[in-house]
Amino acid sequence: METKKEEEKKLELVTTHICTATDIGVFGNMFGGKMMSIIDLSSGAYASQVCDTPRMVTVKIDEMVFKNPVKVGNIIKLYATVKEFGNTSVTLYIEVRKHNVYTGKQEVVVHTTIKFVRIDDEGNPIPISTRVKKRYEERVSKHGKGLLSSEELVEEKNSKP
């Protein structure tokens, strides 16, 4: 099991969101349910990319502690990394940061872990292939991240014998 600092080194930007008036709760901060929705949808997309399948469902979200408020006009960035693979599941470490466009500094707003399970057409859990797990780990080892840009994918493909 990796430490939080080791996980942070492998974080990949998944999405950016600007907080609008429709995201705000009654006390002037981003509504917690909106943040949870952003986390669930974005990490589901990340899990699907990592596992090469759109058929990933959320089965567990660990504790979420909201550390800093998000106001209208704030930009938040969601980062993710694979914490571990199971037979049919992938657990992600998620960190959402508020980004200051003037200074470039970021502060953590919330972090959590979220688990997704791969399912078949009937909704039954099915294994995540060993190839997917191995490829992800090789990419992290080589590139420091598991998902690659289009250019990196072409380079990776061309470098194979």
Show which residues each predicted segment covers.
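HotDog/MaoC-like acyl-thioester-processing domains
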Residues: 2-4, 9-13, 71-72, 83-161
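Short, ordered coil/turn segments that flank beta-strands lining enzyme active or ligand-binding pockets
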Residues: 22, 26, 121-122
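Active-site-flanking beta-strand signature of metal-NTP-handling nucleotidyl enzymes
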Residues: 14-18
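A conserved, well-ordered hydrophobic junction motif at loop->secondary-structure transitions
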Residues: 24-38
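Hydrophobic beta-strand-centered segment that forms part of the acyl-chain substrate-binding groove
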Residues: 8-10, 30, 44-79, 83-85, ...
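Short, residue-level hotspots on alpha-helical faces of the histone-fold
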Residues: 37-41, 45
